[in-house]
Amino acid sequence: MNLFDFFRASKKVSTASVAKERLQIIVAHERGQRSTPDYLPALQKELVEVIRKYVNIGSDDVHVALENQGSCSILELNITLPDR
C-alpha cells in the first residue's frame, strides 16, 4: 500500500451508502408532497369505534380531511348518520 492508495481509499463511498442517501432523499421528498399526515387513518378508525358505541354506522360513513390554509390547519370531520 503506497501513500496514494491511502488517500484514495478514504474518498471511496460504498454503493450501499449512496443508495441509502438517495432513498432518504426520495422518502423525504414523498413525505413533503403528501397532503395527509400519517395519523389520519388511525384517527378515523378510532372515531368510528367511539361513534359506534352510540350510533350504528359503517366505517365508510366517517370522512376525515386535513386542510392547510396559511399557518392554520383545519381538521374536517363528516359523519353520515342513519335515519331514526
From Swiss-Prot:
Keywords noted in UniProt: Cell cycle, Cell division
Coiled coil: none
Superkingdom of origin: Bacteria
InterPro entries found in the cross-reference section: MinE (IPR005527), MinE_sf (IPR036707)
Family per record: Belongs to the MinE family.
Role played: Prevents the cell division inhibition by proteins MinC and MinD at internal division sites while permitting inhibition at polar sites. This ensures cell division at the proper site by restricting the formation of a division septum at the midpoint of the long axis of the cell.
Protein name as it appears in the record: Cell division topological specificity factor
Species in which this protein is naturally found: Pseudomonas fluorescens (strain ATCC BAA-477 / NRRL B-23932 / Pf-5)
Lineage: Bacteria, Pseudomonadati, Pseudomonadota, Gammaproteobacteria, Pseudomonadales
